[in-house]
Amino acid sequence: MSGAIYGIGTDIIQIERVEGVMQRTHGRFAEKVLGPDELRIYQARKARSERRGLAFLATRFAAKEAVSKAIGLGMHWPMTWRAVQTLNLPSGQPVVRYSGELADWIAQRGLHIQISVTDERDYAVAFAVAELQSKLSA
């Protein structure tokens, strides 16, 4: 399924910093950074607990940064905040979904990205591995 490592990326962010940005932007930061599926999940978590909402937002921000590093683009076109979403399978495993021109860019290079995200009281962390998909068919 996967082959050689194309790149790795990691990011850590202080959740309090995300809280400050949300206050300064009156909540618009979440709309700028999160994709549509992530935004729905964020809003549901925030409705249950402000802290859970902030932790979710922080992990997704860190995931986008980690992915941008793993694919070697940083935050430059076609890598945009909303073009990458980190969602969860029913098992809880986080998975990366791409859209738009970034999806084409990823497909052209034959990449697959693995992601891990976690948060603790003060910090959110993400680690991404971009792999070249094997050309061999099963």
Curated annotation (Swiss-Prot):
Q: Which Gene3D superfamilies match?
A: 4'-phosphopantetheinyl transferase domain (3.90.470.20)
EC numbers: 2.7.8.7
Reaction(s) catalysed by this chain, per the record, are: apo-[ACP] + CoA = holo-[ACP] + adenosine 3',5'-bisphosphate + H(+)
Q: Which GO terms describe its molecular function?
A: holo-[acyl-carrier-protein] synthase activity; magnesium ion binding
Annotated binding of Mg(2+), by residue: 11, 65
| Listed cofactors | Mg(2+)
State any GO BP term from the record. Answer: fatty acid biosynthetic process
Instruction: Specify the enzyme's EC class, one word.
Output: transferase
Instruction: Tell me where it mainly resides.
Output: cytoplasm
Name its cellular compartments: Cytoplasm
Q: Name one GO cellular component term.
A: cytoplasm
- Write out the entry's keywords from A to Z: Cytoplasm, Fatty acid biosynthesis, Fatty acid metabolism, Lipid biosynthesis, Lipid metabolism, Magnesium, Metal-binding, Transferase
Q: Which family does it belong to?
A: Belongs to the P-Pant transferase superfamily. AcpS family.
**HAMAP family found in the cross-reference section:** AcpS
Q: What does this protein do?
A: Transfers the 4'-phosphopantetheine moiety from coenzyme A to a Ser of acyl-carrier-protein.
* Record-given protein name: Holo-[acyl-carrier-protein] synthase
